């Protein structure tokens, strides 16, 4: 299935996964950008944003678990997020953490909060519609991860 066919499939888990990839880039960029703040609270939230981005890399790009040397404990933690509902919950929690960052004042971290919330909504819609989780082949869903090993 090509990328265009994946988007035409109307499976919300595909939309969630690609929104998650954008979240990875945004969380890493905003985490780094806001870490150079003079506000201690904002620095803490920027570190949390960076950690969220790093976790999302392994959740949304499954073949990285096979090629990166990680511990079995970390692998088991990441493998918990294989259903739409678990991913929706994870994204909602990450989004809530970034929304709380507003206590330190307005910052770019709100963009991460909004996009994480959108990804959570996509995964929740997939769960509500009882759609099976389908990983994008482009990101190592069905096929690429098996070819590597």
From Swiss-Prot:
Segments crossing the lipid bilayer: 12-32, 39-59, 81-98, 104-124
Functional description taken from the UniProt entry: Golgi membrane protein involved in vesicular trafficking.
Protein name per the record: Golgi apparatus membrane protein tvp18
Glycosylation sites: 11
A Pfam family hit: Cg6151-P
Family as reported in the entry's similarity comment: Belongs to the TVP18 family.
Record organism: Aspergillus terreus (strain NIH 2624 / FGSC A1156)
Subcellular localization(s) per the UniProt record: Golgi apparatus membrane
Alphabetic keyword roster: Glycoprotein, Golgi apparatus, Membrane, Transmembrane, Transmembrane helix
A cellular component annotation (GO) from this entry: Golgi membrane
Membrane topology, as annotated: Multi-pass membrane protein
């Amino acid at each position: 299935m090509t990328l265009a066919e994946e988007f035409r499939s109307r499976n919300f888990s595909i939309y969630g996964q690609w929104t998650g990839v954008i979240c990875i880039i945004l969380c890493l960029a905003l985490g780094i950008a806001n870490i150079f703040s003079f506000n201690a609270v904002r620095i803490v939230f920027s570190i949390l944003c960076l950690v969220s981005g790093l976790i999302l890399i392994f959740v949304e790009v499954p073949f990285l678990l096979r090629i990166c040397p990680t511990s079995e404990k970390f692998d088991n933690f990441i493998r918990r997020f294989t259903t739409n509902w678990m991913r929706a919950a994870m994204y909602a929690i990450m989004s809530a953490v970034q929304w709380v960052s507003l206590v330190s004042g307005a910052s770019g971290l709100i963009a991460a909060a909004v996009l994480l919330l959108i990804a959570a909504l996509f995964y929740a819609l997939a769960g509500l519609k009882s759609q099976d989780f389908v990983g994008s082949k482009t990101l190592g869903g069905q096929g690429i991860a098996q070819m590597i090993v």
